[in-house]
Amino acid sequence: MMLIGIDASRAAYPQRTGTENYSLFLIRALLKLDRENPYRLYFNQPPAPDLFPAAKNVEIRAMPFPRLWTHIRLSWEMAPRAPDVLFVPAHVLPLVHPRRSVVTVHDLGYLYYPQAHTRSARWYLQWSTSYNTRAAAHVIADSEVTKRDLIEHCHATPDKVTVVYPGYDPNFAPARDSARLAAVRERYPIPGTHVIYVGTLQPRKNLARLLDAFAVLVKQGRDVHLVIAGKKGWLYEPLFAHMHQLELEEHVHFTGYVPQEDLPALITGARAFVLPSLYEGFGLPILEAMACGTPVICSNVSSLPEVAGDAAILVNPHDTAQLAQALARVLDDDELCHELAQRGLRQVTRFSWEKCARETLAILQSVGRMR
């Protein structure tokens, strides 16, 4: 047996997005899978009692600290009480860590779209990614694209990086409960036929171009709506100004952050799900949409073709006309929508948190045997 320590701080965030959901669902799957090895979960605040199921082999360590929790407080914890193996599911190893440490790097988007980050954020991301790649005993990448980026830009050796695909929340499924659907539609009043985007509002998501493409449909006289569901990120303000400039106020609906439990019904009710990102390390939202039986339109860049397979309409994220044409196709062609929905439901069977946990545990055990 070996003591496995996990930085679980992101799993306890109240408003979770990609990396937080990755931490939460992977840790849950690991604890369900492995009842033998003891686990120590590190938090910067006491977690909700029901965040993880109680188990004899799980210890909770809540260590509040105001700033730089990872590099100061978690490092402090590592010095006298290091686990046999430390796993960090979201990018950043503490400065003090055991030699047997594993980190997941989700993407290197800051290299491709530096304008989507502040100067200080770019510097920190560059430093931390390079540091993690050097310092960790092994690195997990979400996709082959991220692995190639780590090899090319951070000089990682290929045998030090393993691709382990994330899973998706099994609660994402076609919503059939009419009462549930009605409650969600009442909570987020969206008239008529609509397409939906789910994710943070930030430049890398390419939402300004999505508005441009949607404006083409509105000018054609289509009675269609766009739902943008997600919390406000960095540089979100120009997006609202652009919507007003295009006179789309009656057709575009910003819901703000939507809790995880409402998303399946919200996505199921949409004609299509669209993710026009300029870069994604994995693109978990397209899996969630496919699991709901909703047709997907996504960019043909970075990891998205790898995740989508043949189950989505792929578009050039820089081509407004192509994006508008893809939206028009799903609005006009019922047969195409049915085919995409069926392909999506088949595609998601390749991904699960159980599979992700098994592959991750194998890496942790391999690192634990290192001398």
Spans of features found by a protein language model:
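Carbohydrate transferase catalytic cores enriched for Leloir-type hexosyltransferases
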Residues: 1-371
